[in-house]
Amino acid sequence: MWLKIYLLSILAISVFTFVFLFGALPQFEDTAVWKFRKWLSNRPAAIRSWDSKYCGGRLSVVGDFCGSVVAPAAPWSVPILYCAFTTYMFSAYYEDLHPFIAENHWYYAWLAPVAYTILVVSFVLATFSDPGKITKQNHALLLNQFRFDNLMFLEDTECSTCKFTKPARSKHDRFTNKCVAKFDHYCLWINNTVGLYNYRWFLFFLLGNVWTLCWGALLAGLKMIVMVAAEYKDHPKPLPSIFSQWWQVMITNENKRVGIIFLLSVSTGALACAFTAMHFYYIYLGATTNETDKWGDIHAAISEGSVWMFQKPGFKLDRSILLQKDEEGRPNRSLTAEEREYVAQNGLALTLLTDHKPIVNIYDKGFLNNLKAVMFPNSAY
């Protein structure tokens, strides 16, 4: 019974995680995944609206109060939960799997200590390293770290909280209340922002989890094969399906821990692999998670027919100069002096943009260079 509840819970968590991770990608635009993510994102506002209409905002007041009480400890609850989960997995491995592996597959015995070391080191680095906090001391240097593309990041935009000009690709993180250079996202699992300086450690952390969960599934699977073979050695034919054989072995009391290790490793390992692949895809695109969301907004505006771009047939652009017009044809901004000079020198004309492909991402330097920039960020200190 509990195993079925666990499997259903994992399935539900996997669906919601997939929707939130990938639903904003341009490839899913106007699909059921994209629409479901948008619907979920609007639920908090819808609940507050319902509360305001029918309960006079009382539920929101209670919720805000409860949030203020648990807020100081809440950020660390997920990392603590992660550490507890990891500790349980390794203790279960050494009690139920390691003797079998050491006796029958000794060449795999080194995997556990190596994986545990990688997890601990990567978790500490990702959790406690500086993501690229922008301060008065390093602001001038970080301001010149990246060019302004005037698409997602406009010049002379001030952070309303920190009261200084926002460097390109930066964002004020509302969870940690600080501006972060090359902001990617805030990660609950490490209770830290992922940015310019610690993105490499975050990747290290992801790869460490992928490594651990994959070998966990492999080693638990090796023992499951032996247990299933022993259980059905003298079983009358025809034998049940492979799935039924594995399921029956996993739900017996003496095999439950091995079954749990296998199921946890496979289910969470699939999510870890998908999440890691997504981040390498972002590196390939030359974009952060935050910027991918912004690109989604640009694609939506193009679909609405409100985006115009300076271009010329046959001319290869090295930057994109875009304007968004309202219903009355008024542009959202004025061109900078540098943009006006670029348009005049190359004889570019303002035309309606019907496809996102002509847009140049100035931050994309090719996959290898993008990866190099992630692994070896230029220090601003």
Swiss-Prot record:
Pfam family, one: DHHC
Membrane topology: Multi-pass membrane protein
Keyword annotations from UniProtKB, A to Z: Acyltransferase, Endoplasmic reticulum, Lipoprotein, Membrane, Palmitate, Transferase, Transmembrane, Transmembrane helix
Subcellular location: Endoplasmic reticulum membrane
Superkingdom: Eukaryota
Function field: Palmitoyltransferase that targets several endosomal SNAREs. Palmitoylates the SNAREs at cysteine residues close to the cytoplasmic end of their transmembrane domain. May have a role in the cellular quality control of transmembrane domain-containing proteins.
Stated name of the protein: Palmitoyltransferase SWF1
Origin species: Yarrowia lipolytica (strain CLIB 122 / E 150) (Yeast)
